[in-house]
Amino acid sequence: GKMRDYNYIDDVEVLKDNILDEDCKIIYMKQKAEDYFIHIICCQFTDVESLKMNWKELVNNVSEVVQKRLNDLIEIYNVYIVFFQPQVEDSVVYNIEQNKYSSRKIVLRKEMPDDKTKLEQIISSKLFDLKIEKENSEQCCFTDSMDFITSFNDENCEKELEKYIEECAWEAMNEKN
């Protein structure tokens, strides 16, 4: 398939708020899906120590700066933070990727490429893998990651969500029997 279109957002300074790593690199891109955007924030800290100290701060910034401005639930659910960090140990990767607050997180043990085409290839293949995983696992796990949305303005949307959760629960129950 053809490479999907990526749009780059130039203003990433706000995403660096409270991050104590002067040299951290952040790239914020949006990828057009059917009728919405997937938001992807790529980041590389100076070293593993810096990643450990600062990753939560970046997650908070993304939540404040990116997610709070989005109106569509589907876009709010499709925010990814990709941490590029060579030599990072398993426990740190696990810790970050299991964190369900507000965005989905991926840790890649490699340098973040300066070349945009290479970066896009890595991101596309990674997101594609995740999509396959999600389709295979079929469980409804995204709701607890959405605690940060304090109120749904739209009752209809809440009903949709409830319906979705019920369907997931129903499927899970039927699989057991």
Regions found by a protein language model. Name each.
Residues 1-51, 60-62:
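N-terminal "first-domain core" detector
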Residues 24, 42-43, 140-141, 157, ...:
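Generic recognition of cysteine residues
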Residues 31-36, 70-78, 101:
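Flexible, charged surface loops at secondary-structure boundaries
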Residues 43-90:
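Compact, well-ordered interaction domains used in eukaryotic information-processing assemblies
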Residues 52, 56-59, 63, 93, ...:
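Generic detector of well-ordered alpha-helical segments enriched in charged/polar residues
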Residues 70-73, 154-158:
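Surface-exposed acidic, glycine-flexible loop patches that form ligand/cofactor-binding
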Residues 90-156:
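Polybasic, proline/glycine-rich intrinsically disordered low-complexity segments
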Residues 156-177:
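Short acidic DE-rich linear segments
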